[in-house]
Amino acid sequence: MRSNALVLAVVCSLLAVGLGTIGSTPVFALESPAVQSGNVTEAEIETETETGTKNHSAIIKVYPNLPVPQNRGEYVVVTLAQPGNWTLTDGVSTVSLPRNHTGPIAVTRDPHLTQNITRYPVYETASRFRLSQDGETLTLKRDGKMVDKIAYNRATEGDRWHRNASQQWIPEGLTLRETVNTGPATVETFVLPDTPAQPIEPITTATDRVHIGAYTFESWTAAKALVEAHDRGANVSVLVDGNPVGGVSEQQKSVLDTLVAEGVTVHVLGGDRSRFRFHHPKYAIADDNAVVLTENWKPAGTGGKESRGWGVRIENNRTANELYTVYRHDTGWKDTVSWETYRTQIDTTEQPVAAGEFETAHRAKKHTADQVSVLTAPGNAEDAVVKMLRSAEDEVLIMQPQLASPQQRMVRAAVAAAKRGVDVKILLSDAWYSNEENSAIAAHMNRQADAGNYPLAVRVDEPNGRYGKIHAKGLVVDNTTIVGSLNWNDNSARENREVAVQIESAEVATYYRSVFAADWQTDKHDERTVRYVEGGVLILIGLIAIGTIAYAHRSIIFAE
């Protein structure tokens, strides 16, 4: 059993990867002439389209399967752009809505219960309007004519259907966050494997608090810094994913056991009711510093022993506090348990430990940023990336381990920028488990760019001894940069917990532009080589992708 687990761990590891504020909300009966607007942000009442974001009348939320008897308090939220003769129907029952109301409204049979679980103004219907747990179609009409229609499938208990670009179900216990602007800041930029001391350095001086949000935590160097911070009197804790691809490594078990023995709190997020497919961020809060990374807390990542990664240290207490708010949310529900409890329920796997040695080509550098924004997934990160790409004027640089599909929403936005005349470059990993698929997608996108005569180039990386493989998830658009854990696939954007920062700074963009340019260089080919892969090779690539690595790809593309 151990040998099988070892094989699976090695292969998978290499191939991998709301409810509103509770409070008092006005309740209005059917006869009420108007309903006052609640405290709802634009992001919650907008629907993404391919051409932009528009306010319009729509069904925006459905909560049909509450974890209470008879689903009392169930509701559907609609937003109305103008007064009128509005109705909502499921094909069996029809609800008349307030004629003079504009804005969002939660329609319910049980207003006094609903007002405690939503921030929206609540509207009591006198009809026997009930939402189906098994799924149904809801239609919003004005003067008897359809304005919007949605169909939802079977609802898991506690999940809410949320109207956004992905029209996703939001698990119980998860509050979708808005993008939070935390103001100007001093930002230190660095890359890995060049400067492995940088992610750890803020921890070594912390005296008040250190909290780490991680996918995995296997770094003895970071663990030592955490224990020393704890000994200095700081409040120290770690949150890791409970079911990483390949399993929990023996090294991680040893590291976490040591942390707990030394008094550090370790949380594990997972289980059948997990709010996320993977808890996948890589960040640290150290006093008033925030560290946000593309790399995992292990030798191959923060240890500088293998992967090309990007990272930033942000000297700004508002950024640190916002990350701590995310951390408290993620550690504060029933899908999170202590490491002491969790470790008794799992078997560990032997996994290889990276031990590469690389020269320092890029040193850390401090800059001034005009604005820093904290992005999270699920919720706002994908929208922020798409919005940024839509605003591109001159240049887009994308570094990713893999692209799931040319049809992924962020990828489509990058292609659309190129079609507007923006110079777009995409650099993908050459890791053995993704090289063939990345080569195929690069060839496809490059051929499309050639045929359409727009400035897009996609290349599979050639590290040439500078690092082991690309693991960075970085984006530069003109003078704005995004650094974080977000992979460009639907599961990362919509199912995983991801954390990134968006930095408005010409200096930061210039730093990563220089790193990207150096990594883009190759000794073997010019940038168009991958455009002319023979059809037979592409067929072979497709067969390999479908056959030998299909399972691993499905698992890992979501969690690298």
Identify the role of each PLM range.
Residues 25-94, 130-132:
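A structural motif detector for short, solvent-exposed N-terminal "entry" segments of globular domains
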Residues 502, 506-534:
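Short, aromatic-rich amphipathic segments at membrane interfaces
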Residues 233, 421-422:
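Glycine-centered short loops/turns at secondary-structure junctions
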Residues 1-60, 146, 165-190, 328, ...:
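Haloarchaeal acidic low-complexity proteome signature biased toward cell-envelope/secretome components but also
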Residues 68-74, 94-163, 472:
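Solvent-exposed beta-edge/loop recognition patches
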